[in-house]
Amino acid sequence: MYFIDVQGTLISDSDKSPINGACELIDTLNSKLIPYVIITNNTKIKSDEFLQTLRDKGLAIKDGAYLDPFCVLNEIISPCNVALFGAKEFVQTMQDIGYTQDIKDPKAILIASWDKFSFDDFALINELALKGVKIIAMHETSIYKKNGRLYPGVGAIASMISYSTGAKFSSVGKPSLGFYTAALELLKQQNPKAEFKDITIISDDATGDLYGAKELNMSTALVLSGKIDKSSTANLNRDKIDNIYDDVSKIWEILR
């Protein structure tokens, strides 16, 4: 049974094309009836639209096997006035699903990935947090890779805000317990006996995905096709990573 990341794992961070072996891996899981759930920290496009873009790329993801933060956000905070910090696509999608941008009197601060954050943005987030507005990270990705650059991920930014203000933050997507539990419930629709210990999670993000999964007793597989390459593995916590592969084609070769 598998949890499988998307960016840097199934599709390239640079041109969004399927990574070597990605389509074949999904096809094999489908044909062999191996339970899986695609788990992504997508925060730019509505869930159904993003799933369709993946299918259009040749990833034959079956129904009931996809989860992103938008799928579970309503359980954490229902549509209301919020201060949205992130890419324009994130702000627009949040408004499309019923949330209202309000930086003067928000019920919560929501932070998503972006490569254009300024210190003025961080100052505003700090000021709101110090007024008692709760902080919600859309996920806890460690690094946001875009155009070949490695920007601080949402998890890193939320941790910085927490450190500077003393305010704690909650997380919607990976690696939060709530998100992984929701993914497990989807997996149980394929195999009612599924437990975390039965799952192998495949991702390119050791800190943002795999370390938290390991704490839940999942097996962890790091792929070097995204945020981390062979030259930057020195700082990995190898106690929390069971296997390292160049890309998902190596896992497909084992399964086929």
Regions found by a protein language model. Give the residues of each.
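Acidic-and-aromatic substrate-binding clefts and catalytic sites of carbohydrate-active enzymes
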Residues: D15-I19, I45-K46
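Asp-based, Mg2+/Mn2+-dependent phosphohydrolase catalytic module
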Residues: Y2-V6, L10-K16, C23, T28, ...
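Structural recognition of the conserved hydrophobic beta-strand(s) that form the central parallel beta-sheet
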Residues: V37-I39
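Conserved phosphate/oxyanion-binding catalytic-loop motifs
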Residues: N42
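Active-site donor-binding segments of glycosyltransferases and PAPS-dependent sulfotransferases
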Residues: V72-I76
